Structures are given as C-alpha cells and as structure tokens.
Amino acid sequence: MECIAIVLLQQFIGISWWWLLVPVLSYKFLIIWGSANIRSNFYTKAHCSAETSEKVIAISFDDGPHPEYTPKVLAVLAEYQAPATFFVIGKNIAGNELIIRRIHENGHILGNHTWSHSFFIDFKGKKAFREELSATCDAVYNIIRKRMNFFRPPYGVTTPHLAAAARAEKNHIIGWNIRSLDTTSDSEMKIFYRIKAEIRPGAVILFHDTSAKTVEVLKQTLNFAKENGFKIVSTGELLKLKAYA
C-alpha cells in the first residue's frame, strides 16, 4: 500500500518517486534499528549501564539454567566472591530446580528471559508475551518464593507488545553495554580481549552460561577486574533497582 501511495503521489505532483521513497525507507530503517538496539530505548526504557566514575561493574548470564555449565559458572563466581544475575529461560527450569535454588542461595539475582526464547517471539502480541513472562516468573517463584522484577528480552530486541507486556508485569528491562559474543566466537582469547577493551565504570557485561569457553573467559574477566581495581556488584546495586517484588 505504501508503494502504491508513493506512485500515485508522484504522478499527482510530478516529483521523482525516489525522493518520496527516502522518508519511507528512513522510517523503516529507524524502526529496525530501534527494535534491535536495546540501548536505544526506542519502545521502552532499558537499563544497560550506570553513570558513575566509581570502578564498579555487573556481570550477567543469559539462557540458563544449563545442567553442566551453570554449576561451573557458579563455582567460579564463588571463588572470586562475585555476584551475578542469571536471566533464565522458563522451559529450561524443569529438571534444574536445584540449580535455580543454588543460584538464589549463593546470593545471585534471578531474572526473566521468557519461557520459550523462541526465534519468532518478537511476533507475539501483548497477551502471549505476558504469558511468556508470567509462566517463567511462576516457575522461579515456586522454587525461591520470590517474584522476579528483572526481564531481559531475547536477542535484545524490543517491540511495542513486549514493552506493553513488561509494563503490565511491572518488570524492569535490563540490557547491557558489553556483549561478550561468547555464543558466536570460538576463540576464548577474542572474547576476553573484546571485554577487556570495552570494560569501564558502570558496565553491564553479557555472558551465556551455556558453554565451556564462557567459564574460562569468566575467570580471565574476573582476574582482570581484580587486577585493575574493578569491583563486581549485582545489577540491582549497580542500577539501583529492586530485583524482586
């Protein structure tokens, strides 16, 4: 319909259709960019870092719980006495309830990463999105008896329906400003040097507790933070937000 309207308008006023197409394409690009860039705050506010000169940072993990790697991540965090936030996928909880309990009892924060983490989740409406959030929240509540306030959108993509669902569930949307790319790179060195180059006061680092390389890079990151005077704090403390209802 947009293309037909452009052609008719071009015929009526005699302007090259290329000039009429520019604002349409610009608008489309803006929508795509705003949706895909969680730090843009395009549809909703996302807390991605803290404005501070103090050398404090927060660490977060997506896509767990994983029966093999989440316990290894927890062991590393315990060794360095570092808090973290775990954004869990609801469908991964069954069979891993003890890991969820261990995350909580070790003093870490649990956050919502939807129930399915479907590749097509961003096409869901508000009602379906709320079901994704509430089902995961209920599953975690049944284990730790606390309701999660933190929500991280799958793939970091936001939509109007996601924003409406998060508001309805009274969730804080938590993003990041350092993406480790630990799911796309096979090189532990590249992942670590990417983090090392970007680390700064107030940063929120995104990892995934789903692979052996993340466990090794986490050790390197925590060593680097310690050697360079960075303190690891929880996302709640860093962003001054309440993690549970």
Identify what each model region corresponds to.
Residues 23, 67-74, 187-191:
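Short, acidic/polar
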Residues 1-58, 75-85, 197-245:
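Terminal accessory/targeting
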Residues 74-88, 108-109, 125-157, 164, ...:
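CE4/NodB-like, metal-dependent polysaccharide N-deacetylase domain
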Residues 61, 88-90, 112-114, 153-155, ...:
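A cross-domain feature marking catalytic cores of carbohydrate-active enzymes
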Residues 157-159, 163-198, 230-242:
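His/Asp/Glu-enriched short active-site or ligand-binding loop at hydrolase and phosphoryl-transfer sites
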Residues 72-73, 98-102, 161-165, 217-221:
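A short acidic, amphipathic alpha-helical/loop segment
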